[in-house]
């Protein structure tokens, strides 16, 4: 696992086994410092069931899986949602996960998140931690956060990537001001990746039906 992560950061590229195309892992992939923070959040929360929106080149998924393995629960499972894996990314994210030996830990969904998340909710799935790095338009991020808030156990952690983007920060702001979520931590701000760790509400939603706070 660690050797695959170290190689990815050292080489910065990967050759797709599917079609031989060469892919630059960065800046699409998260930084080493964000990866470490993500892994530590998984460990700190003792997460067992995790979910990620946007597999991409798999750098974040590798760190999440590293955290799950460190937690040592045999029921650990990481769901990755990415409808573009076999097109834009040449299946490189899944390839790196296979090379790291964690394929059995990972469940890949090739549907768009706005389709997959309601289906998971309908089927009764539940998760302990989520990482959001998919569609960065406001409506996409908003839907991801709202559905994840229902899919995660109360008081769980959602880590949103690219918090520096207005669409992401505004969607997060709605959840903080209207849903009782708490901003637990943010990473160092830069123009490529800026993450925010959010804790969902712990109690029942007791808002009146007309409730709304400007965000």
Please report, for each region that a protein language model flagged, where it lies by residue.
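S-adenosylmethionine/decaboxylated-SAM
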Residues: 24, 28-215
């Amino acid at each position: 696992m660690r050797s695959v992560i170290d190689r990815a950061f050292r080489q910065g590229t990967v050759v797709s086994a599917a079609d031989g195309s060469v892919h630059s892992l960065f800046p699409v992939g998260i930084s080493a410092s964000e990866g470490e923070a993500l892994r530590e959040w998984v460990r700190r929360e003792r997460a067992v069931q995790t979910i990620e929106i946007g597999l991409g080149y798999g750098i974040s998924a590798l760190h999440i899986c590293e955290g799950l393995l460190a937690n040592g629960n045999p029921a650990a499972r990481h769901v990755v949602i990415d409808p573009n894996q076999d097109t834009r990314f040449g299946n490189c994210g899944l390839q790196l996960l296979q090379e790291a030996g964690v394929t059995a830990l990972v469940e890949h969904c090739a549907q768009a998140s706005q389709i997959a998340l309601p289906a998971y909710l309908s089927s009764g799935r539940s998760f302990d931690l989520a990482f959001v790095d998919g569609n960065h338009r406001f409506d996409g991020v908003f839907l991801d956060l709202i559905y994840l808030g229902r899919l995660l156990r109360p008081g769980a952690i959602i880590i949103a990537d690219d918090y520096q983007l207005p669409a992401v920060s505004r969607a997060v702001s709605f959840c903080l001001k209207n849903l009782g979520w708490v901003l637990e931590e943010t990473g160092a701000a830069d123009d490529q990746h800026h993450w925010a760790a959010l804790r969902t509400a712990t109690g029942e939603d007791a808002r009146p039906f007309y409730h709304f706070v400007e965000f």
